[in-house]
């Protein structure tokens, strides 16, 4: 994923609905498989774990609502935790052979995925929280679709 790439899916989840964002995440995950030129799965399960689960996890950002900033923050945190857990589990299952000496599959996957995804989720969450969500809801003409 590129820097701040979760922002559009987080906004779909928060401004429209979690269901729409989950489906959008599936679509993004499928498209990413074809549009990322160097991506090659090591196992068919990786397609499910990394591309469908982790992309759709961002849809959970809208499950607490969008009427208060703390609800948006809780949703972003939940979505980030689910996404990081999915990537970490995928790392253990499919990339344990890359583990550094003495680290083991879990240690390697946690270190790798935390170093990649925590900054990504923090920056994306900060951007979404800095946006005028009330004005955006008004501009798109939606208060909440559920």
Describe every region a protein language model picked out.
Residues 1-15, 19-20:
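Hydrophobic transmembrane alpha-helices
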Residues 3-8, 48-56:
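Membrane-embedded alpha-helical segments of multi-pass membrane proteins
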Residues 4, 39-48, 63-146:
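Membrane-embedded alpha-helical hairpins and interfacial helices in multi-pass inner-membrane proteins
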Residues 12-14, 61, 65:
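Helix-capping/transition residues at the boundaries of transmembrane alpha-helices
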Residues 22-23, 74:
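Signature of the 12-TM Major Facilitator Superfamily
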Residues 24-36, 78:
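Small-polar-interrupted transmembrane alpha-helices in polytopic inner-membrane proteins
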Residues 29-30, 55, 113:
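Helical-face signature of the major facilitator-like transporter fold
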């Amino acid at each position: 994923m590129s820097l701040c790439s979760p922002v559009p899916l987080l906004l779909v989840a928060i401004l429209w609905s979690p269901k729409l964002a989950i489906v959008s995440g599936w679509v993004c995950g499928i498209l990413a498989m074809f549009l990322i030129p160097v991506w090659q799965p090591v196992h068919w399960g990786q397609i499910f774990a990394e591309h469908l689960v982790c992309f759709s996890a961002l849809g959970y950002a809208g499950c607490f609502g969008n009427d208060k900033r703390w609800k948006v923050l809780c949703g972003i945190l939940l979505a980030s935790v689910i996404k990081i857990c999915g990537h970490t589990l995928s790392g253990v299952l499919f990339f344990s052979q890359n583990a550094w000496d003495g680290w083991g599959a879990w240690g390697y996957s946690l270190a790798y995925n935390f170093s990649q995804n925590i900054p990504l989720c923090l920056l994306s969450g900060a951007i979404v929280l800095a946006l005028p969500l009330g004005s955006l809801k008004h501009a798109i003409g939606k208060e909440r679709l559920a």
